[in-house]
Amino acid sequence: MASLKEIDSRIKSTSKMKQITKAMNMVSSSKLRRAEKNTKSFRPYMEKMQDAITAVAGSNSTSNHPMLKSRDIKRSGYLVITSDKGLAGAYSTNVLKSLVNDINSKHNDSSEYSLIVLGQQGVDFFKHRGYEIESSLVEVPDQPSFKSIQSIAKHAIDLFSEENIDELTIYYSHYVSVLENKPATKQVLPLSQEDSGQGHGQMSSYEFEPDKESILSVILPQYVESLIYGTILDAKASEHASRMTAMRNASDNATELIDDLSLEYNRARQAAITQQITEIVGGSSALE
């Protein structure tokens, strides 16, 4: 049995750890509220952007823009979104596991796909396992701005436009609620009929200048960048929710451990007192 001093030391260290996890839970809760607000605020912009795409591309089924045309898949592109930091439960692990399973089932070697990785967790995961990373972005802000992720979004689009990849799929954790986050995939290139042919509002008649193809060449890359950014906002909300849940569970486990240690401490203290009384009584009997 551990000594009273050892048990007391464990109680104190666990209590300090509980204070840390409780504080991290509160911080993650605050970040989650902001992330939810960011995602909600971005949604109307995406709907209006999709209306504009519908007005141009939806009425122009003969468009030859490469982002709207499917082609034979010779090389796939995967954009995977993970966290920079740990302590978020299985947030990054579930996404990475989903991607690796798909890579193993669809591809025979690394020449058939390219990896674009967001987050230090993903970078470390693939480097330690010998995967080749096309490009990466780490230290993504907790509340990312469009500018902070635009470079990697543009790089992914350029890979498709230059036919270095023939499709682009995002792997991320989709935020459903505080208690539910699930790995998800989203194909962003080539754009699907749903992306380019369905608006959210009442359509009006438009006149296009200089012409539809020129407009598409400008607006489609911006739209895909926005799709990627919106997905990152969703993933960030999921990350904060996962970390908040993990820290709450850690705090609850710490409370349970402190209770168990306190009970063990009291039993050990009672046993020590009983031993001391027994020794005193034994000593008195010997003197008689």
UniProtKB/Swiss-Prot annotation:
Superkingdom assignment: Bacteria
Keyword RNA-binding listed: no
Pfam family of the protein (one): ATP-synt
Subcellular location: Cell membrane
Protein name: ATP synthase gamma chain
Membrane topology category: Peripheral membrane protein
Gene3D superfamilies listed in its UniProt record: 3.40.1380.10, ATP synthase, gamma subunit, helix hairpin domain
GO cellular component, as recorded: plasma membrane; proton-transporting ATP synthase complex
Subunit annotation: F-type ATPases have 2 components, CF(1) - the catalytic core - and CF(0) - the membrane proton channel. CF(1) has five subunits: alpha(3), beta(3), gamma(1), delta(1), epsilon(1). CF(0) has three main subunits: a, b and c.
Keyword set, alphabetical order: ATP synthesis, Cell membrane, CF(1), Hydrogen ion transport, Ion transport, Membrane, Transport
Source organism (scientific name): Staphylococcus epidermidis (strain ATCC 35984 / DSM 28319 / BCRC 17069 / CCUG 31568 / BM 3577 / RP62A)
Family annotation (CDD domains): F1-ATPase_gamma
Location (main, coarse): membrane
Primary role: Produces ATP from ADP in the presence of a proton gradient across the membrane. The gamma chain is believed to be important in regulating ATPase activity and the flow of protons through the CF(0) complex.
SUPFAM superfamilies found in the cross-reference section: ATP synthase (F1-ATPase), gamma subunit
One term of GO molecular function: proton-transporting ATP synthase activity, rotational mechanism
Family: Belongs to the ATPase gamma chain family.
GO BP annotation list: proton motive force-driven plasma membrane ATP synthesis
Record-linked InterPro entries: ATP_synth_F1_ATPase_gsu (IPR035968), ATP_synth_F1_gsu (IPR000131)
